[in-house]
């Protein structure tokens, strides 16, 4: 019997592995379906790749190896920006290119369904594995990069540098390679000056190191001088899993530096973020608008950070510096909705600091051209915050569980909470929820903007600063037990008149914005005043129709059921194909 049992269990394991391996292969970035039929002219080797016409349509018939960039016969050098562009389509057809050079110097066409491997020395030039540079329309879809880059200037796993006039789209792309650069760096794109960029469902798994701006998805979007007023970056469903470290500038999980409007939605950072001298954040490092173009603003929604964030000046779990440069802020707005930070936030240095569990610094206007007021709605911090400032007594360190500092006349700070501890050696400018420098008494500002917010206590740190006085309007201090019991989640939801926060009582130490599919983490108040999740409904008739198998018969019954399910799934899959 033992031998029979071993054979049956081994068979089940083999079948399970095969089944899940097929599922994983179907979802692999760069791959195509078995019945996929590419269009165009077949490429079978490096010579065929080099001979491609600039506007042709091509596909790979097999894996190939390259040691040179396609450049229409023009040498790749510091003048590559003026090289003939490839405006056609290259379909990888699920195949792999192994290369020691970027595929293109100037791509203004489409690359899709491709895996790229190898190692590239950027030679101090702007460098991207798919293309070094672009100006025009660029589309990259379903591309996986495994090729490392060292010695690059502006560098990206897919695109290095996009000049003014670029309209770039990246969908379902992934970078698995480590990248090292001297300037802007991103797992997908290094720097796009403007006009429009759309990045959807892209992932960075590589570790990135730069001397300047660095982020898991795109290092920088928008230019400081002459920024176009309608430049917009839309980044949705993207994830960074790699460590991002910068010597200066800004570091972030999704985008490091932004000059222009942006919507950053449903993005996640899981990689440690480090900046040696300046700004760090889990999602967005810094926004600016030096030319006062009154760009529409920035919306960060449904984004989460799960990793440590370490920096010096502006350090935030979700965002570092969110706003324009000094003066003339009216009409430009920043807003965060439904965002949460779980990572520890640490600032170390000797100069002025702005540190926040959600956002370090916010500076905007009244109501943006998108009709939304500035502020944070339904945002939280569950990470611990630490500030170590070695400056003298004149140095200010603004630190808070939600937003370190903001300066605006119309602001929403609503349904937010801080469940992390705050440790700082400078407490003068520390608050549990936030510090508003404009505050009550300034034109257009009332206490109504700040409401229904909660925080755990951290020593004698006041809950909130509103203008000339420190006060607790709209903010309540709660104990760790009140957070863990579900009470805070319930109270916020009750006051908001909607179910915003969820919590698995007994498991989650604080509320979350993520609902369980079965509704099991909804928080309810019981008759005795305690809080609990909904009781699981038990069907009235739980008696089985037939006797429950036991012993060896139960084992055999289970094995047969598994094999039957796998067989049905296989047949169904064949019919679909």
What are these regions (language model features)?
Residues 4-7, 549-561:
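Short, hydrophobic alpha-helical membrane anchors of single-pass surface/secreted proteins
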Residues 1-27, 567, 576-577:
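Sec-dependent, cleavable N-terminal signal peptides
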Residues 15-31, 546-554, 572:
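Sec-dependent signal peptide cleavage junction
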Residues 554-574:
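A cross-kingdom C-terminal cell-surface attachment/processing module
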Residues 533-552:
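Short, aromatic-rich amphipathic segments at membrane interfaces
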């Amino acid at each position: 019997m033992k031998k029979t049992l071993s054979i049956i269990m081994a068979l089940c394991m083999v079948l399970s592995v095969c089944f899940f391996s097929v599922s994983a292969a179907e979802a692999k970035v760069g791959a195509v379906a078995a019945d996929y039929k590419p269009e165009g002219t077949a490429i079978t080797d490096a010579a065929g790749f080099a001979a491609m016409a600039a506007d042709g349509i091509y596909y790979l018939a097999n894996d190939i190896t390259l040691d040179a960039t396609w450049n229409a016969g023009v040498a790749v050098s510091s003048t590559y920006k003026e090289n003939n562009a490839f405006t056609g389509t290259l379909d990888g057809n699920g195949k792999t290119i192994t290369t020691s050079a970027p595929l293109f110097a100037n791509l203004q066409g489409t690359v899709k369904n491709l895996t790229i491997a190898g190692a590239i020395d950027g030679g101090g030039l702007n460098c991207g594995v798919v293309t070094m540079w672009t100006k025009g329309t660029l589309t990259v879809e379903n591309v996986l990069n495994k090729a490392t880059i060292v010695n690059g200037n502006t560098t990206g796993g897919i695109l290095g540098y996009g000049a003014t006039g670029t309209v770039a789209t990246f969908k379902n792309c992934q970078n698995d390679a480590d990248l090292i650069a001297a300037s802007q760096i991103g797992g997908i794109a290094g720097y796009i000056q403007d006009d429009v960029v759309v990045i959807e469902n892209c992932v960075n798994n590589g570790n990135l190191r730069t001397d300047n701006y660095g982020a898991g998805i795109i290092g920088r979007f928008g230019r400081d001088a002459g920024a176009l007023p309608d430049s917009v970056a839309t980044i949705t469903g993207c994830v960074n899993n790699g460590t991002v470290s910068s010597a200066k500038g800004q570091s972030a999980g999704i985008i490091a530096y932004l000059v222009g409007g942006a919507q950053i939605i449903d993005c996640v950072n899981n990689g440690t973020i480090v900046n040696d001298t300046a700004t760090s954040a889990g999602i967005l490092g810094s926004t600016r608008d030096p030319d006062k173009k009154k760009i529409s603003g920035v919306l960060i929604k449904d984004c989460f950070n799960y990793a440590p964030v370490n920096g010096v000046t502006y350090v935030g779990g979700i965002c570092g510096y969110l706003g324009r440069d000094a003066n003339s802020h009216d009409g430009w707005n920043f807003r965060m909705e439904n965002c949460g930070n779980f990572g520890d936030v640490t600032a170390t240095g000797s100069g002025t600091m702005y540190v926040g569990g959600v956002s370090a610094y916010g500076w905007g206007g009244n109501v943006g051209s998108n009709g939304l007021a500035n502020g944070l709605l339904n945002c939280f911090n569950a990470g611990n915050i630490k500030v170590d400032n070695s400056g003298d007594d004149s140095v200010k360190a603004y630190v808070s569980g939600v937003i370190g500092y903001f300066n605006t006349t119309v602001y929403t700070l609503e349904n937010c909470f801080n469940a992390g501890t705050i440790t700082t050696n400078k407490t003068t400018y520390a608050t549990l929820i936030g510090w508003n420098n404009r505050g009550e008494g300034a034109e257009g500002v009332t206490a109504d903007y700040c409401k229904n917010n909660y925080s755990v206590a951290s020593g004698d740190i006041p809950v909130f600063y509103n203008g000339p006085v420190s006060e607790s309007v709209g903010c309540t201090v709660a104990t760790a037990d009140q957070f863990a019991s579900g009470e805070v989640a319930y109270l916020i939801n009750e006051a908001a008149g909607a179910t915003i926060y969820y919590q698995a009582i007994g498991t989650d130490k604080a509320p979350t914005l993520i609902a369980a599919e079965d509704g099991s983490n909804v928080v309810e108040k019981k008759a005795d005043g305690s809080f609990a999740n909904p009781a699981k409904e038990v069907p009235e008739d739980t008696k089985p129709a037939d006797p429950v198998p036991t012993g060896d018969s139960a084992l055999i019954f289970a094995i047969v059921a598994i094999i039957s399910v796998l067989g049905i799934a296989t047949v169904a899959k064949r019919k679909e194909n």
